[in-house]
Each structure stands twice: as C-alpha cells, then as structure tokens.
Amino acid sequence: MNEIDVDEADILVLSQGLEKTSRLTHQVNKSLAKISKTSAQSSQLFGPILARNNVLKTLQRNIDSTLNSVASVKDLANEASKHEVLLRKGIASLGLKPFTVELHKLEDMYQDMSVGNSRHTENAEFHGILKHLKEMITSSEEQLELEFIQILKRIEPFDPQINMEKKIPFPYYSDEDISQMLIIFNYFYVKSEDSRMQDIFIRERGDQMLKSMAFMEPFAKKVTSSKNAPYEKGSSGFINYTEAVLGFIANERSLIDDVFSQFAEIKPRVLRNILDPIVAAFCKVLMSDLIFVKSNIDNAGLFSFELTECISGVQKSVKGMNLKNQMQLIDADKQVKDVTRSLFKDTVDRIKSKTNQMTTIPSDNGVTEATVDTMSRLRKFSEYKTGCLAAMESISRDVWLSKSFREKEYTIQSAAIADNETAASLLSCFLSDCIDTLVANLERRAQTILMPNQEPDVANPNSARNKFKQRIGFLVLMNMTLVEQIVEKSELSVMLGNLGKARIEKLKKRYVNYLVADWKDLTVNLMDTVVIDSVGKKSKDKEQIKEKFRRFNEGFEDLISRTKQYKLSDPALKRLLKSEIVALLMPMYDRFYGRYKDSFKNPRKHIKYTPDDITNVISQTLR
C-alpha cells in the first residue's frame, strides 16, 4: 500500500470543495437572473395598474368635491331664492326699509361668492347663480333709483309768485318723504359712497327750481310799462324774482340738512351744485334788466339801486359756498354799482344844468323849477336808501364832485371828510353837496341875471360887487324853505343825519347874512362920527348928526318896505331873520340914540324912531 501524502490529500479535498462551491454559485446566479427577469416582468405588469389606481383615487376626490360643491351651490341658490322672492314683490308691497334690508343681504351673499369664486372656476351652475345675483341686485337698485326720483318728483314745478302773493310757503317734502330718501341714500352711500344718488338729487332739484323760476322770468325782465315811462319803485318783477330765488335757496338749505343729516361732509357739494345753475339764471335775468337801465338811464336809472339790493341779498345767501358762478355775481354787482355811482354825478350835473336854464328870477322871488326838480330827485333817492348805502361802499366824494369844484361854495371842505367814512356818512355828504350845489348855482345864476356885466361872486356875504344881496338872499332862503319841508317829510331827514342838517343851517346862516347885509350897511352909517358930548356941539357936528338920523330913517324905511315885499312864509325863517336884524341893529342904534337924542330942540323932527319903535316895526314886519 502506497503511503498517502497529507498535503496532497488536503489539496484534493480543497479542490473538490471549490469545484462544488463553483457549481452552487453558478446555480445561484442562474436563479437570481431568473428572479430578476420575473421581477421586471411583474413591474411592467403592475405599473399601469398602480397608475390607474391613482387616477381612480383622484377621481374619487373630485367626485366628492363636486358633490360637496353641488350641495353648496344648491344651498346658495336656495338662500338667494328666498331673498329674490321677497325683492320681486317690489317696494310698494314689501316696504322700502325691508326692501333695502333684503337687498343688503343679497349684496353680502354676492360679495361672499365673489371672494370664493376661485373654488368654482369650472362650475357653470355656480357662475350662473353669481350672474343672476348680480342682475337681481342691479335690477333692485334701479327700482330704488326710480323710487328716489318719484319721491323727488312729488313736488312739481310751480309759480312762486302765487305762493308769495298768498303768503304760502314754498312746497316742502313730508317727513315720510325725507325719511324714505334718507333710507335710499343711506343704502347707496354705505355700499360704496356712490355719488349716483347725489347726482340724481342735484339734477331733479335743480330742474324743479329752474322750471319754477321760469314762470317769473317774463315779468322779471320787464322794468317799466314802456320805454319812456319813469320807473316806479318796487314795480319791477325782478324784485319778486329775487325774493323767489332767496326762498329757493333757504328751502334748499333746509332740505339738504334734512335729507343728508347723517352725511355732513357731502352737504356743501350737493348744495353748491344745485344752486350754481340757479345763480347763473339769476345773473342772466339781472344783466338783461341792466342793459335796459343803461339804455334808459333817465327813466330807469334809479332801478339800479334796487338791483344792488337784490344782488346783495343773493350774495349774502350764498356766502361761503364757493359757487362756480360766484364771479358772475361779483361782475354783475360791479356793473350795477358803476351805474348807481354814475347817478350821483349825473344828479349834480343835472342840478347845474337846471339852474343854468333859469332865464329870469321868479317875480315873487319864490321857488324855482330847478329846486323842485332837485328835491324831487333827491326824494326819489331817499326811497332807495338801502341801495344808496350799498352803492356808497368804497367810494369817495370825487365820484360826484369834480376835483376842480369851488370849495368855498360848499358847507364842508374835503379835508374834513375822512378816507374811511361810513357809507351813511358819505350818503349824507352827497345829499348835502346836492343842496349846496343847488344853492350856489341859484345864486350864481341870479347874479348873472341881475348883474350880467360882471363875474358872479358866490357864497360871499361881504362881497362889494354884489349889489343885490338882499334879493338874492331872499330868493335862496325861499327855495331853502321848500328844501327843508321836503327833507322833514321824507326819509331824507334820516339820511342827512345831524351833520347834514347842520350843513343846511350853515347855508341858511350864509343867506340870512345876505338878507341882513343891507342892515349891516345901515349900522355903518351910525358908526361914522366923532363921539363927543351933546353939550357944546358945534353947529357943523349937529348937521352931521341930523344927516345921519335922516339917512338912517330913510334906509330903515326902505329896508322895511323891501322886507315886506318878500312875504316870508316860514315862521322859523322869520324868527331867525328878526333875531339877526335886531342883534345887528339895536346895539348900535341904542348907543347912537342915547347919545344924540337930546342934541336937538325939536327931537321928533329929526329922530323918527325910538329904540322901542324900531323893535316894534321889525317885529310887526316879521311876525
């Protein structure tokens, strides 16, 4: 037996083991390859199944969502249908307040659905409901607008003249109407501060007022009955037209306060937009009348004072509103005041013209046509006191007196008139200047008639050239008597005031001095002598004294005779003249008489009057 090598044996065993392992590994690999092939086939088979399963899951979710959406839309449709049924009953059946409540609910539902619109982008039924809601809301809001308009139209255009004549207030909405308008306006304003209802309110109210004012326009544009007829105060239809405009403005203020009581911030806009066309219509009629006045200033000029009052009233009523047509009012006011101010100058020029037309002095030295015309015109001015005062604002004396006027002929100097004089003071000054102008020009014309070959010396009681002072003084004072009578019996007395009356007294004093100027010359005769004692008078001195008494007697009797001819009728003027003559004459005559009454053997031959006689004769003449 051969001996076995151990190492070879180990190698053999190991080789056999490796061979066996290799075979097993090969078999495992074959199995793994088969498994891999089978897995790939399974993956190909189950992939579509899994994908379909996922699709089915998605479809399930969509179906569930759709079912929920359909249920939700059904609920919304049912809810909307309830509100729609109520709204379709209409405002008259449902009532205005419930109608707006239901409409608000529908509006809220629409807003909620619009916000959630993204969840229903492919739901045609949802969009149909949304569209229907919008249409229903729009239709209901249109009903509200129509209701608002119908309420506004419950007041129809009317003739304001009838209401004013019957003293009936302009039509106004009932509390219920105002409450309903407030409900409607509140709905739209709360919704979006929409200005639609404001615009409707502005349009309807403006149209109603314009149509009402149109009733009065034909009468407002008629100033006088005919072109050549003088205007009578208060006769123009424009005055009532203005009263109606002021009534409309006041009415509209109250209405807007009531309707928009909860919306103070929009009141100014609404009122401004309503009144703008009203003011424009007012200005249009006013300018039509002003054109007529300018073309017929002699007959219709005084109407401009009433126009001034009318404009002033409207300006005050719309003050602070910032109207678009505010400038129209301002321009109209300026044009009217230009006319009224021209009347002041025209009046002064007219006085001069009328006095220059005087060709003879009245035979009784009485009232002249110029005086009658002047005072008639000034009395007319007094009927328009308010308009005159308005026209006097911000003007000066230069408006009616030229800068070259003779200041000495007037009873007040320009330096005495302040730059900031009140309208009342300026009006008094104007009236007094008219009277001064009348008197000064009467004197100037009288001097020209009586002394045609010399330049008149006016307003000068001491003039040596004026040989007719007494006659001229009497002429002026007789005319001033009429002036004072008219002043006292009219509003001129108030308009002149204390200063104006003082100026009249100053004028009277001037021409009383004219009347007593000859009396003053008479007293001068008594002064021209050397005063010596009666004892030891020379014969020559006595002759001079006799001559002075003779001249005095003749002069006194001549003056008394002339004074009687004038036939003064004014008691106050008589008393004033008597007082002036006595005060001027008696002190000198008393002194002269006392010194020389015993100078003659037969005093009565040379001295015809004692001081008491003189006083009595003067008193009898001027009683």
From Swiss-Prot:
Keyword Kinase assigned: no
Keyword Chloroplast tagged: no
Swiss-Prot/TrEMBL keywords: Exocytosis, Protein transport, Transport
InterPro entries attached to this UniProt entry: Cullin_repeat-like_dom_sf, Exo70, Exo70_C
Gene Ontology, cellular component aspect: cellular bud neck; cellular bud tip; exocyst; incipient cellular bud site; plasma membrane
One record GO biological process: protein transport
Any one GO molecular function term: phosphatidylinositol-4,5-bisphosphate binding
Gene3D superfamilies, per database record: 1.10.357.60, 1.20.1310.30, 1.20.58.1150, Exocyst complex component Exo70
Primary location class: other
Compartment(s): Bud; Bud neck
SUPFAM superfamilies xrefs: Cullin repeat-like
Similarity comment text for this entry: Belongs to the EXO70 family.
Protein task: Involved in the secretory pathway as part of the exocyst complex which tethers secretory vesicles to the sites of exocytosis. Also plays a role in the assembly of the exocyst.
Protein name per the record: Exocyst complex protein EXO70
Lineage, opening ranks: Eukaryota, Fungi, Dikarya, Ascomycota, Saccharomycotina
Gene: EXO70
